[in-house]
Amino acid sequence: NPCCDAATCKLKSGSQCGHGDCCEQCKFSKSGTECRASMSECDPAEHCTGQSSECPADVFHKNGQPCLDNYGYCYNGNCPIMYHQCYDLFGADVYEAEDSCFERNQKGNYYGYCRKENGNKIPCAPEDVKCGRLYSKDNSPGQNNPCKMLCSNEDEHKGRFLEQTGRGKVCSNRQ
């Protein structure tokens, strides 16, 4: 390391730092230099302070802050909305399904439920149907499935947390 004296394991005279995201040529990076890029609208970029070689802690916007033109709300640095979850699970040309698909979540069976309690599938209340199993519409050529779902015994593929489900309502804890 050109900033350190190998014999003493200390910084050389005139060096402020030897490593770090905010260390350039043995000096602290200028204040305002980006050291961690934004990962989403809810995760702002971090910038060097000019007083340290380390990038400040990764911080997110407060959970519940509106994002994506008020379509969703920030949650742990992301703006979770159903379109993104459909895309993540099924790929391009797949979108949130029609409301009628989500009504299946009132049945409390493998094909539709809100949550599990002691192994039992609990149906969604009518106002919570978009907080249960996720349904997507596949617009790919040759596909004709308006209510596509991931067939899995796992309980993770649910409507995303903190998405607006109408008139200021959001999903939280699958309700």
UniProtKB/Swiss-Prot annotation:
<dbReference type="InterPro" id="IPR006586">
    <property type="entry name" value="ADAM_Cys-rich"/>
</dbReference>
<feature type="disulfide bond">
    <location>
        <begin position="67"/>
        <end position="79"/>
    </location>
</feature>
<dbReference type="Pfam" id="PF00200">
    <property type="entry name" value="Disintegrin"/>
</dbReference>
<feature type="binding site">
    <location>
        <position position="43"/>
    </location>
    <ligand>
        <name>Ca(2+)</name>
    </ligand>
</feature>
<keyword id="KW-1199">Hemostasis impairing toxin</keyword>
<dbReference type="Pfam" id="PF08516">
    <property type="entry name" value="ADAM_CR"/>
</dbReference>
<dbReference type="GO" id="GO:0006508">
    <property type="term" value="P:proteolysis"/>
</dbReference>
<keyword id="KW-0106">Calcium</keyword>
<comment type="function">
    <text>Snake venom metalloproteinase that impairs hemostasis in the envenomed animal.</text>
</comment>
<feature type="disulfide bond">
    <location>
        <begin position="42"/>
        <end position="74"/>
    </location>
</feature>
<keyword id="KW-0964">Secreted</keyword>
<feature type="disulfide bond">
    <location>
        <begin position="114"/>
        <end position="124"/>
    </location>
</feature>
<dbReference type="GO" id="GO:0005886">
    <property type="term" value="C:plasma membrane"/>
</dbReference>
<feature type="binding site">
    <location>
        <position position="58"/>
    </location>
    <ligand>
        <name>Ca(2+)</name>
    </ligand>
</feature>
<feature type="disulfide bond">
    <location>
        <begin position="101"/>
        <end position="147"/>
    </location>
</feature>
<feature type="binding site">
    <location>
        <position position="44"/>
    </location>
    <ligand>
        <name>Ca(2+)</name>
    </ligand>
</feature>
<keyword id="KW-0645">Protease</keyword>
<keyword id="KW-0482">Metalloprotease</keyword>
<comment type="similarity">
    <text>Belongs to the venom metalloproteinase (M12B) family. P-III subfamily. P-IIIa sub-subfamily.</text>
</comment>
<dbReference type="GO" id="GO:0008237">
    <property type="term" value="F:metallopeptidase activity"/>
</dbReference>
<feature type="binding site">
    <location>
        <position position="59"/>
    </location>
    <ligand>
        <name>Ca(2+)</name>
    </ligand>
</feature>
<feature type="disulfide bond">
    <location>
        <begin position="35"/>
        <end position="55"/>
    </location>
</feature>
<dbReference type="GO" id="GO:0090729">
    <property type="term" value="F:toxin activity"/>
</dbReference>
<dbReference type="InterPro" id="IPR018358">
    <property type="entry name" value="Disintegrin_CS"/>
</dbReference>
<keyword id="KW-0479">Metal-binding</keyword>
<feature type="disulfide bond">
    <location>
        <begin position="131"/>
        <end position="171"/>
    </location>
</feature>
<feature type="disulfide bond">
    <location>
        <begin position="22"/>
        <end position="48"/>
    </location>
</feature>
<dbReference type="GO" id="GO:0005576">
    <property type="term" value="C:extracellular region"/>
</dbReference>
<keyword id="KW-0325">Glycoprotein</keyword>
<keyword id="KW-0862">Zinc</keyword>
<protein>
    <recommendedName>
        <fullName>Zinc metalloproteinase-disintegrin-like catroriarin</fullName>
        <ecNumber>3.4.24.-</ecNumber>
    </recommendedName>
</protein>
<dbReference type="GO" id="GO:0046872">
    <property type="term" value="F:metal ion binding"/>
</dbReference>
<feature type="disulfide bond">
    <location>
        <begin position="17"/>
        <end position="23"/>
    </location>
</feature>
<feature type="disulfide bond">
    <location>
        <begin position="3"/>
        <end position="26"/>
    </location>
</feature>
<feature type="binding site">
    <location>
        <position position="46"/>
    </location>
    <ligand>
        <name>Ca(2+)</name>
    </ligand>
</feature>
<keyword id="KW-0378">Hydrolase</keyword>
<dbReference type="InterPro" id="IPR001762">
    <property type="entry name" value="Disintegrin_dom"/>
</dbReference>
<keyword id="KW-1015">Disulfide bond</keyword>
<feature type="domain" description="Disintegrin">
    <location>
        <begin position="1"/>
        <end position="63"/>
    </location>
</feature>
<keyword id="KW-0800">Toxin</keyword>
<dbReference type="InterPro" id="IPR036436">
    <property type="entry name" value="Disintegrin_dom_sf"/>
</dbReference>
<comment type="subunit">
    <text>Monomer.</text>
</comment>
